[in-house]
C-alpha cells in the first residue's frame, strides 16, 4: 500500500541523496486524519523538535486520532466488499446509515447503525464527546462529500456541546 510505496521511495531517495535523512511512518490514517497528524507533527517541529523527536511524536500520536464517519449511500460499501449486496439493498430500503470508524490497525469497522442521517450525525457528536481529549486544545476536523450543511450542523453541535476546536 501507501506505506510500502513510501518505504521504497525513501530508500531510492536515500541512495540518491545520502546526506539526507528520511523517516517513513505508517500513519494508519486516512483523509483528514492524516492531515491532522501532519499538522500536529509540523507544530512540534515548529516548536523545535528534531526529526527523531517529531517522528516519535507522530508514532505515539497516530493511535490517538479517531476516524469516525457516516455514509448516506451503501452502494460504495457494497462495491468495496464491506457489506453484502443483500445488506446494501435492505439497508437502503430501511434508510440505514452506518456509523463507521478506523481501528488501531487501519481497518474500517462498523460501529453502529442509525435509522436516519440526522441520528447518525448525532451519534458522531456523542462519540466525539466520549473520546475527545482536551477538545479545546486538540482540533477536530470535519470533512464531507457534498453534504456541507450537515458538516456545518455537526460543527455547530460540537462547538455548542463540547466547546470543541473544529476545522471544517
Predicted regions located by residue number:
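Mixed-charge interfacial surface used for oligomerization/domain docking
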Residues: 2-23, 29-168
Amino acid at each position: 500500500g501507501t506505506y510500502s510505496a513510501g518505504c521504497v521511495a525513501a530508500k531510492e531517495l536515500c541512495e540518491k541523496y545520502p546526506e539526507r535523512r528520511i523517516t517513513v511512518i505508517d500513519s494508519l490514517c486516512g483523509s483528514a486524519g492524516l492531515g491532522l497528524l501532519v499538522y500536529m507533527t509540523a507544530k512540534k517541529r515548529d516548536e523545535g523538535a528534531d526529526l527523531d523527536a517529531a517522528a516519535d511524536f507522530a508514532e505515539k500520536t497516530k493511535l490517538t486520532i479517531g476516524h469516525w464517519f457516516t455514509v448516506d449511500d451503501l452502494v460504495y460499501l457494497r462495491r468495496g466488499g464491506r457489506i453484502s449486496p443483500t445488506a446494501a439493498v435492505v439497508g437502503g430500503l430501511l434508510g440505514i446509515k452506518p456509523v463507521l470508524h478506523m481501528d488501531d490497525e487501519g481497518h474500517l469497522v462498523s460501529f453502529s447503525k442509525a435509522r436516519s442521517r440526522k441520528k447518525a450525525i448525532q451519534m458522531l457528536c456523542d462519540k466525539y464527546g466520549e473520546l475527545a481529549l482536551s477538545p479545546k486544545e486538540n482540533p477536530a476536523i470535519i470533512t464531507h462529500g457534498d453534504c456541507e450543511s450537515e458538516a456545518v450542523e455537526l460543527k455547530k453541535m460540537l462547538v455548542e456541546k463540547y466547546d470543541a476546536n473544529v476545522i471544517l
